[in-house]
């Protein structure tokens, strides 16, 4: 079974972003994407481990799942953005040095246009002006400025040019003065986005296998709970509303060191929005893909989970119909009353129940089907 690479995952996310509206209603497009996704799911089955509780039994009996908000996860770094402010500060300084003049020019031109002033100079003219007419303290070298102006305009036109140049100098000085403060503003914006992402997402996590001891111990009450098997082999035979959320299903990538989110595009976008009210960066597919990729990384110590997950917007709709249950597995130490309840639910759902028992060599588990007469 091939593993989905990060490059493949990013391409999938980009496709979903490009087809954001289509995947809400286009059944053919959604089925195509789900089919491609399931090629990476072993046997097209995934598993969920649960404790025995009234809520969990009721949700299962109704053929539903409970999708908790990401902000309830024990791992505070899950479903969030991993940044390195100090490392990105160097990258941002490079950006300021290499791309700042273009941003300054664009902002100055926008400022002039909004004030009815024609900006006749090209970007190259502005670069030359900044390099030759402004000293290291940001002050104008008047004699060089005069020489520069005389090359472009008549005396009558000079006042208009000075207005455009003054606006450029004003913006440039402001940026230079508050450079560190802007980096902090971006950092705070990312922190707000981290919180918003965890608050705004409902997430359902599943595993590739049912025989994972750590999951039985951590999520199934140390073998006293149960495991739900979901099969997606015949998902397309069900109504579109029942399977449409599977389009968001993706695997987790486990890393010893979590990849950092590159703040530079975010930094530029926040600055453009703050100064020029340009919000186009928020719709940039590449930036949004990189943000979404951050939701599918976890530390390597969680690799035993072999997790897949999908998320939807948090609209208070934690309970979702999910009619894909194909089998149930009872933990070896499940109490008799809970076992009877699980078997009753299995009859209603028309799926088999297996009981976890030590194997003959006593070094693992077998899963034996439970007959009704034995319950």
Can you say where each PLM-predicted feature lies in the sequence?
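Partner-binding and oligomerization surfaces adjacent to conserved cores of proteins
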Residues: 2-375
